[in-house]
């Protein structure tokens, strides 16, 4: 069917409990699209935020190619995992967010705007045991491939008439 691009901006998070015992937490997120027919899942990773502590700011754009037929089968899931970067030991998982792409697509179609706009959403970060660990803030946008987005362009005005053309000379 229609090839589209799912653009996800991973904005920030708010983690409830400190993971590191010593020093500031350096949190980062990996976003992976599972369920696609293209073989291995597409993945994007944010940089570790060493300044934000339990409230990191990333503002990282991740783009995933999806087909409308894949969305309709309800197999596509965007998995965002928030991790804590550590120096001496392996990185620790804070928690994950599993987002069905079909729900995002249905929400974006309910707005029915001619020019698509990003939609801000928040999801609960859950531990492996299902306990809430924080909130992940992101925005998303579906773009149809092959169509030009004319929203940043402006129509040019007509050039001014020269005085010699007005007189008919």
Q: Can you say where each PLM-predicted feature lies in the sequence?
A:
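Calcium-regulated, polybasic anionic-phospholipid
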Residues: 3-55
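Peripheral membrane interaction modules
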Residues: 1, 146-169
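Short structured motifs
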Residues: 43-48, 63-65, 119-124
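Structural signal for hydrophobic/aromatic residues that build the beta-strand cores
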Residues: 6-10, 27-31, 46, 62-64, ...
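Short Pro-Gly-centered beta-turn/loop motif in secreted/extracellular proteins
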Residues: 67-73
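A beta-strand/beta-hairpin structural motif
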Residues: 55-67, 97-101
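C2-type phospholipid-binding modules
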Residues: 20, 73, 79, 83-153
């Amino acid at each position: 069917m229609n090839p589209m691009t799912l653009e996800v901006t991973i904005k920030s998070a708010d983690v409830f409990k400190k993971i590191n015992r010593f020093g500031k937490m350096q949190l980062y997120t990996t976003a992976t699209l599972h369920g696609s027919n293209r073989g291995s899942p597409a993945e994007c990773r944010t940089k570790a935020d060493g300044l934000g502590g339990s409230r990191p700011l990333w503002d990282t754009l991740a783009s995933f190619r999806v087909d409308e037929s894949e969305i309709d089968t309800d197999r596509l899931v965007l998995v965002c995992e928030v991790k804590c970067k550590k120096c001496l030991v392996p990185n620790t998982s804070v928690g994950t967010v599993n987002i069905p792409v079909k729900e995002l697509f249905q929400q974006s179609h309910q707005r029915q705007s001619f020019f698509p706009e990003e939609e801000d959403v928040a999801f609960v970060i859950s531990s492996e045991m299902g306990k809430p660990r924080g909130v992940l803030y992101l925005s998303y946008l579906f773009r149809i491939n092959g169509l030009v987005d004319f929203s940043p362009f402006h129509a040019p005005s007509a050039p001014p008439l020269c005085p010699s053309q007005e007189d008919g000379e």
